């Protein structure tokens, strides 16, 4: 398995993570990790940076120490209309966005409202590439329609190792398996992520791989091989400088 890409990682800029961007890059370089996606929390999350931070990611070189850097954000879904907390003038400088629910920003609502919030975000934002930690048991969701719409819009579903390891969003395991099985059923692309808040966890996909092996997820749906991931993003007009 050549799963040497991780698009859900955090730096000290998120306010509750513990390594810098350069420390993350150096770790990846030493470990042979080929693609690092840096995706700090959007500004609506307590402790997170001003949106200028995301707009200014343009100053970060594309390749540092042989590691390809993808400039992203874990954007917060703000409301049922699917609005997120990254303005267009900052979004234009990003390679991708993850859209996620976080309890301090979006209080869990009904199944219909939670589902509509995600669907509306899918429809609104071209830079949305990944739906984050859908297995969170605090948010009831219609997984089937979300996975179908992700497939129709060529959006990846995250298989979040932190959720499965019990480090975050306790009780996500059952829902994560449901989501993964629906991705297999509908042919929706998935991406393994660490959700690392310290560099030692970058590309730790151990629990995610266990789950995908258990359900016999087709390898062609797993997007972590660097060449496959770059081809996917280029097919959507991204990464034209690679």
Regions found by a protein language model. Give the residues of each.
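Extended substrate/RNA-proximal surfaces in nucleic-acid metabolism proteins
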Residues: 2, 42, 47-159, 213-222, ...
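Histidine-centered divalent metal-coordination motifs
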Residues: 8-12, 41, 133, 197
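Histidine/acidic-residue-rich catalytic or RNA/ligand-binding cores of hydrolases
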Residues: 15-19, 48-50, 140-147, 167-182, ...
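Alpha-helical scaffold segments that flank or form the walls of functional sites
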Residues: 22-36, 59-62
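Short, conserved active-site loops that position catalytic residues or coordinate cofactors/metal ions
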Residues: 36-42
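Short acidic/histidine-rich active-site segments
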Residues: 41, 188-202
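His/Asp/Glu-enriched short active-site or ligand-binding loop at hydrolase and phosphoryl-transfer sites
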Residues: 156-168
């Amino acid at each position: 398995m050549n799963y040497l890409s991780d698009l859900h990682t955090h730096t000290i800029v998120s306010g509750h993570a513990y390594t810098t961007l350069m420390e993350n890059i150096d770790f990846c370089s030493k470990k042979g990790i080929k693609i690092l996606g840096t995706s700090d929390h959007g500004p609506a999350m307590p402790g997170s940076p001003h949106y200028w931070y995301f707009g200014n990611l343009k100053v970060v070189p594309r390749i540092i120490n042989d590691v390809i850097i993808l400039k992203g954000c874990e954007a917060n879904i703000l409301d049922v209309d699917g609005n997120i907390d990254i303005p267009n003038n900052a979004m234009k400088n990003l390679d991708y966005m993850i859209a996620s629910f976080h309890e301090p920003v979006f209080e869990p609502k009904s199944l219909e409202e939670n589902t509509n919030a995600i669907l509306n975000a899918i429809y609104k934002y071209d830079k949305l590439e990944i739906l984050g930690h859908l297995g969170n048991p605090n948010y009831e969701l219609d997984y089937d329609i979300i996975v179908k719409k992700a497939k129709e819009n060529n959006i990846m579903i995250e298989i979040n190792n932190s959720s499965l390891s019990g480090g975050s969003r306790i009780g996500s395991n059952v829902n994560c398996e449901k989501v993964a099985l629906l991705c297999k059923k509908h042919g929706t692309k998935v991406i393994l992520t660490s959700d690392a808040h310290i560099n030692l966890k970058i590309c730790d996909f151990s629990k995610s791989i266990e789950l995908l092996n258990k359900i016999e997820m087709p390898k062609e749906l797993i997007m972590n091989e660097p060449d496959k991931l770059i081809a996917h993003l280029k097919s959507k007009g991204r990464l034209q400088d690679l």
